[in-house]
């Protein structure tokens, strides 16, 4: 049974909004990336994301988007297909007065097929039961800038497509995570 005193909150760990709490709703498969994993990731990426464009697929709580905004990313796009979860991200955006975060209530594939934008950094952290990796790998190159950094988190060990080169990896609890770099000259679908 769920603890009635438990609050669905997660803390921003770095940058301008460091220590601010954001609330998130209950949704199937929603599990914010752990603090220690985010700390490691942003040590890998750097604490200052000034000038970068960021895509947060499967945004969930929005914590990865808020971490990027807190570190001065130029533009952040959050994709979330659960309407209540997307609305909660919008509420937190307003609360934190973040103007460069754009939230889209849509599925990842619709966004990837239709956006003209490309990104420097992409966060991919779908629910554990999600298994559409092959299709994702087909659409992903369309939105990647040369040398884009792609963070992937999932329950199983991660098999990267040929166009992504693993740079760093780790494990926390049952989550495996990888930071990879896009190489345009390698084989793409």
Regions found by a protein language model. Give the residues of each.
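Class I S-adenosyl-L-methionine-dependent methyltransferase catalytic core
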Residues: 1-189
């Amino acid at each position: 049974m769920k603890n009635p005193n438990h609050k669905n909150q997660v803390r921003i760990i770095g940058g301008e909004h460091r220590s601010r709490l954001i609330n998130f709703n209950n949704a199937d498969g929603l599990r914010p990336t752990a603090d220690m994993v985010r700390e490691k990731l942003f040590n890998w990426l750097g604490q200052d994301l000034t000038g970068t464009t960021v895509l947060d697929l499967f945004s969930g709580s929005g914590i990865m988007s808020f971490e990027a905004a807190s570190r001065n990313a130029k533009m952040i796009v959050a994709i979330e297909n659960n309407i209540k979860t997307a609305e909660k991200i919008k509420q937190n955006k307003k609360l934190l007065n973040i103007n460069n975060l754009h939230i889209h209530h849509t599925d990842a594939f619709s966004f990837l097929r239709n956006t003209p934008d490309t990104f420097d950094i992409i966060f991919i952290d779908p629910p554990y039961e999600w298994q559409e990796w092959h299709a994702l790998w087909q659409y992903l190159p369309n939105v990647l800038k040369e040398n884009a950094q792609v963070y992937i988190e999932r329950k199983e060990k991660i098999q990267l497509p040929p166009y992504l080169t693993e740079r760093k990896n780790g494990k926390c609890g049952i989550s495996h995570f990888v930071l990879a770099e896009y190489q345009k000259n390698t084989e793409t679908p």
